[in-house]
């Protein structure tokens, strides 16, 4: 059975495009180490392993292809900047294409990360079930030895997902491939946060690819994408008079309320296992909308790709956060006598009220002057 699974993985790897030939060997080897289970293998499990293997290989092929495309565009951009006769339109188009490719790379990489994390969680659970009886017997045997040898400490050697041996107490820690930021919870604020009753709403959990997609709503006629449902309804007017009626332009939620239908409200769950906003968390708090779910996942579980050009310090994972920061970055309007600088007047006044002898510096209480050119 083990040899049969290895042959099937090799057959799946051959279906991938030739552009990832340099990576196929490592990928197929790692997939064998993760998915092939010589102890228990069922038909359903084999089908799931095939789907996961194809998903990983497809995402890897996408990453390899997009990286080569970015290399070509960057080379074109560098040549065009040195060429005086090159038009600015082609240069701006190349920059726009580079940004689009970066977003696709982030989507594929995040999808691979999420798949690996789910596989690690499932692998740990399977190991716990299989080795449960053996672990209990080992603990009983070791405790009996401790009665005759008090100086002996029971230590277990285990192998993690990457084949690295670890030593420690008997436990199966839930390890995560965390390369994102962690969030701190303020219990004083959470105590006053109201949570809707569980029977009054439905929980929807979108995939990582859907959360990182550029658009959420798509036209079923022409396929054009939109970020908001209202924009899609306005777009539908171009496809015929039947979409220009008042009923077609009203939100479906408003129609349900007006018609007396008692539909449950939809809330959303973060797909990241262990997150406070994941529905399997013991202190789960639902996200109110798709926009909230998308922004939460980007801010909490994605790398901060956008850097402020003014201060070169602040990094953001959501573009709108960068735009908000750039509005006041570098504009020092309020200064304390101690030399501390603030971008807002209320922050300065709070600082002055906390420290005795601190006063606003000369000229900081005046509103900034605006000069029109």
Curated annotation (Swiss-Prot):
Location(s) in or outside the cell: Nucleus
Keyword Disulfide bond set for record: no
Gene Ontology CC: nucleus
Keywords, ordered alphabetically: Metal-binding, Nucleus, Repeat, Transcription, Transcription regulation, Zinc, Zinc-finger
Keyword Oxidoreductase assigned: no
Tissue: Expressed at low levels in roots (e.g. root tips and lateral roots), leaves (e.g. at the edge of mature leaves, possibly in hydathodes, and in vascular bundles), flowers (e.g. floral filaments), stems, siliques and cotyledons.
InterPro entries with a match to the protein in the record: STOP1/2, Znf_C2H2_sf, Znf_C2H2_type
Principal place of residence: nucleus
Function text: Probable transcription factor. Together with STOP1, plays a critical role in tolerance to major stress factors in acid soils such as proton H(+) and aluminum ion Al(3+). Required for the expression of genes in response to acidic stress (e.g. ALMT1 and MATE), and Al-activated citrate exudation.
Protein name, UniProt field: Protein SENSITIVE TO PROTON RHIZOTOXICITY 2
Source organism: Arabidopsis thaliana
């Amino acid at each position: 059975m083990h040899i049969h699974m290895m042959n099937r993985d090799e057959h799946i790897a051959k279906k991938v495009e030739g552009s990832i030939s340099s990576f196929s060997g490592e990928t197929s080897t790692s997939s064998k180490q993760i998915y092939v289970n010589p102890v228990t293998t069922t038909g359903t499990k084999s089908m799931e392993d095939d789907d996961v293997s194809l998903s990983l290989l497809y995402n890897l092929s996408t990453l390899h292809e997009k990286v080569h495309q970015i290399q070509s565009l960057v080379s074109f951009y560098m040549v065009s900047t040195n060429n005086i006769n090159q038009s600015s339109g082609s240069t701006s188009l190349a920059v726009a294409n580079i940004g689009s490719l970066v977003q696709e790379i982030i989507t594929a990489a995040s999808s691979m990360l999420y798949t690996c994390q789910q596989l690690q969680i499932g692998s740990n659970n399977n190991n716990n079930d299989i080795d449960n009886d053996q672990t209990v017997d080992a603990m009983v045997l070791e405790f009996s030895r401790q009665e005759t040898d008090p100086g002996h400490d029971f230590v277990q050697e285990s192998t993690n997902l990457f084949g690295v041996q670890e030593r420690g107490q008997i436990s199966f820690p839930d390890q995560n491939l965390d390369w994102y930021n962690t969030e701190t919870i303020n219990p004083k604020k959470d105590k006053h946060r109201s949570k809707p009753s569980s029977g009054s709403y439905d929980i929807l959990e979108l995939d990582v690819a859907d959360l990182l997609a550029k658009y959420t709503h798509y036209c079923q006629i022409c396929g054009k994408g939109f970020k908001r449902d209202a924009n899609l309804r306005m777009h539908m007017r171009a496809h015929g008079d039947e979409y220009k009626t008042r009923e077609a332009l009203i939100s479906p939620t408003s129609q349900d309320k007006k018609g007396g239908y008692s539909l449950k409200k939809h809330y959303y769950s973060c797909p990241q296992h262990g997150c406070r906003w994941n529905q399997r968390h013991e202190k789960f708090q639902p996200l109110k909308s798709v926009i909230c779910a998308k922004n939460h996942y980007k801010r909490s579980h994605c790398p901060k790709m956008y850097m402020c050009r003014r201060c070169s310090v602040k990094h953001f994972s959501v573009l709108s956060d960068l735009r908000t920061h750039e509005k006041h970055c570098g504009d020092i309007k309020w200064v304390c006598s101690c030399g501390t600088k603030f971008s807002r007047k209320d922050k300065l006044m709070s600082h002055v009220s906390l420290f005795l002898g601190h006063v606003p510096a000369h000229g900081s209480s005046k509103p900034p002057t605006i000069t029109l050119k």
